[in-house]
């Protein structure tokens, strides 16, 4: 339920951080500083990692969950970095904090887990510290934490799919975009974002052209997606050939459309409804018990 996404009581808060899904990802250029320019239709689901917060006399961070061993729990973690960022950005309001992250999503998987966690910290502290700072301003400031952090912050604030341009800072809300039933599948191999972009041979692909009216229904959206791309799939496939097997499994389980998200290795399948997605997830997990398989419902109009 939407009301369960972010909960606060007596200074204690928790949030299920957003899963970020690039339904399209067109790489249309590269800046002189090395940052790539993208155009992406991005969907979200509030079924990611669980981040809890409470005020504390000194800073503490606890990392647990099935994928915790694959992350660092020191100053390199985005939860810690996001808290440090907020303390420096708002020194008069800054307070020590206790954060506990239950890591439920695979690491380095192309669905914005770390960025979603950073956005969760920013969102919780903005609320708990009573900051006079708009989501838009905070999103602009947060770009230093990572290109996906601003869009994840927008997702937490506005709970809508987004159209993202530039290096991730140019964000448009898609208020009439439909919700989607999906299945996420990850075969277990981590794919480093830098490695994928390094393997990208062309950096000036054609821009994204999609009729916003097509986003209103599942059928019209699926049809429109056929004319779009994820320009990072081919370089990611060179690093992780198993991606083809994952997409095949999604298609065989009845997906209307399947694609890799972000830089991988997580792939998604779009299904006609929640029941079809759940059945497909059971089928894929039965055939591939070692894979990460998760049925989700995205933000959007029902």
UniProtKB/Swiss-Prot annotation:
Keyword Iron-sulfur found: no
An annotated GO BP: isopentenyl diphosphate biosynthetic process, methylerythritol 4-phosphate pathway
EC number: 2.7.1.148
Binding site for ATP: 106-116
Pathway: Isoprenoid biosynthesis; isopentenyl diphosphate biosynthesis via DXP pathway; isopentenyl diphosphate from 1-deoxy-D-xylulose 5-phosphate: step 3/6
Active site: 20, 148
Keywords of the record: ATP-binding, Isoprene biosynthesis, Kinase, Nucleotide-binding, Transferase
Sample GO molecular function, one term: ATP binding
Catalytic activity reported: 4-CDP-2-C-methyl-D-erythritol + ATP = 4-CDP-2-C-methyl-D-erythritol 2-phosphate + ADP + H(+)
InterPro entries: GHMP_kinase_C_dom (IPR013750), GHMP_kinase_C_sf (IPR036554), GHMP_kinase_N_dom (IPR006204), IspE (IPR004424), Ribosomal_Su5_D2-typ_SF (IPR020568), Ribsml_uS5_D2-typ_fold_subgr (IPR014721)
Keyword Cell inner membrane set for record: no
Family (UniProt): Belongs to the GHMP kinase family. IspE subfamily.
Record-given protein name: 4-diphosphocytidyl-2-C-methyl-D-erythritol kinase
Annotated source species: Bartonella quintana (strain Toulouse)
């Amino acid at each position: 339920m939407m009301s369960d996404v972010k909960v606060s009581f007596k200074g204690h808060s928790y949030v299920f951080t957003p899963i970020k899904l690039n339904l399209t990802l067109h790489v249309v250029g590269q800046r002189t500083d090395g940052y790539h320019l993208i155009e992406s239709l991005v969907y979200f689901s509030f079924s990611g990692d669980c981040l809890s917060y409470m005020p504390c006399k000194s800073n503490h961070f606890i990392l647990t969950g099935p994928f915790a061993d694959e992350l660092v729990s020191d100053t390199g973690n985005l939860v810690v970095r996001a808290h440090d960022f907020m303390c420096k950005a708002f020194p008069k309001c800054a307070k020590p904090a206790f954060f506990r992250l239950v890591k439920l999503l695979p690491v380095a998987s192309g669905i914005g887990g770390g960025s979603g966690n950073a956005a969760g910290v920013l969102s919780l502290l903005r609320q708990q510290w009573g900051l006079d700072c708009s989501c838009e301003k905070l999103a602009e400031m947060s770009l230093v934490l990572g290109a996906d952090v601003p869009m994840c912050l927008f997702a937490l604030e506005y709970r809508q799919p987004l159209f993202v341009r530039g290096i991730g800072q140019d964000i448009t809300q898609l208020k009439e975009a439909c919700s989607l039933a999906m299945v996420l599948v990850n075969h277990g191999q981590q794919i480093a974002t830098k490695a994928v972009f390094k393997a990208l041979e062309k950096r000036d692909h054609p821009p994204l052209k999609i009729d916003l009216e097509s986003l209103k229904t599942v059928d019209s959206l699926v049809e429109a997606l056929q004319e779009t791309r994820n320009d990072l799939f081919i370089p990611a496939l060179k690093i992780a050939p198993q991606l083809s097997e994952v997409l095949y499994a999604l298609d065989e389980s009845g997906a209307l459309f399947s694609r890799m998200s972000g830089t991988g290795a997580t792939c998604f399948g779009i299904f006609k409804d929640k029941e079809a997605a759940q059945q497909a997830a059971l089928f894929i997990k039965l055939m591939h018990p070692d894979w990460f398989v998760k049925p989700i419902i995205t933000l959007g109009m029902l």
